[in-house]
Amino acid sequence: MIRSMISRLLPLLFAAAVFAEAPRPRPGFEGVGVRFTSASASGSGKAEDSATGFEVTGNFPLLKSGSWQYDWGFRYAQTRHDWTAAPVSFDLIRGASLNLSGYASTEAGRSRYAVLQVNGDAAEGVSLGDALTVQALYGADWRRSDTFTLGYLFLAETRAVRSPMVLVVPTFRWQFAPDWSLGTGRKSLVLERKLDEAWRASLTLAYQQEEARLADFAGQRQDYESERVAALFGLRRTADGRTDELTLGWAFRAQARREVGGVESEYDLAPGLLISLGSRWRF
């Protein structure tokens, strides 16, 4: 019965993975992390974007009220781009976020979480204050059995290039074998295997997105958005309050949008190799 349920819900489950950008708080969520990324283009004749960057994140306890634990958090990121045969030519994107999040768990196997996040992503020379977007997220999970958790996610957000979005979709995690699980992640669908008490391996179908306010073009506002669909292999080690993760993957579908003065244009990006290395320290 569970298998037939998942097959019917797969389109919506993928939508949950695609659009759930804000962090989903949970017990033990507090900590700081750093991640380095690299993306190289394949040289297939399409517009090419080779990029390197880093991201620093943190989540810190704020207060406890009843069954809810509230945190505040931040993100700061920089990505440097090297373009070939593309209609855009910016070099550096800076991004920052502030969020207020909360989570609550009950003895009945239900957990709830909520996030309000303000983002700003802009090219060098453009104020982050001119590139603000807002995202609100609320969700709940129910542990239906020892191996299956089902929930939903409500998301409302403003976006740099396209119109605001409101979405309600299901989420899940299914442990279909003692060391195997399948579930929705952050903009991803994740198949994970437990190797031992410290190590996990995963295969992920991921959606990656970048939005930014660019410098005005001929006196008109200019915005940029890119999207990638990628297959990723990851190794993660968690021990002594620290998590280290290495990810290798291939972006097999990539597209970008550029909006100037309200007029939008699209172009394809070349596929390419993705590498990510990160660590997170829990409090």
What residue ranges belong to the model's regions?
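Residues that define the transmembrane beta-barrel architecture of outer-membrane proteins
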Residues: 48-54, 90-98, 128-134, 164-168, ...
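Outer-envelope beta-barrel architecture signal
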Residues: 25-32, 66-72, 108-114, 144-150, ...
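Residue-level signature of outer-membrane beta-barrel architecture
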Residues: 58-62, 102-106, 140-142, 174, ...
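Outer-membrane beta-barrel "beta-signal"
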Residues: 168-174, 179, 231-240, 268-283
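Outer-membrane beta-barrel translocator domains and adjoining extracellular loop/strand segments
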Residues: 40-49, 81-89, 124-132, 161-169, ...
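Outer membrane beta-barrel transmembrane domains
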Residues: 86-89, 190, 198-265
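Short glycine/proline- and aromatic-enriched beta-strand/turn motifs that initiate or cap beta-hairpins
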Residues: 20-84
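Transmembrane beta-strands of outer-membrane beta-barrel pores
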Residues: 36-42, 74-82, 118-124, 154-160, ...
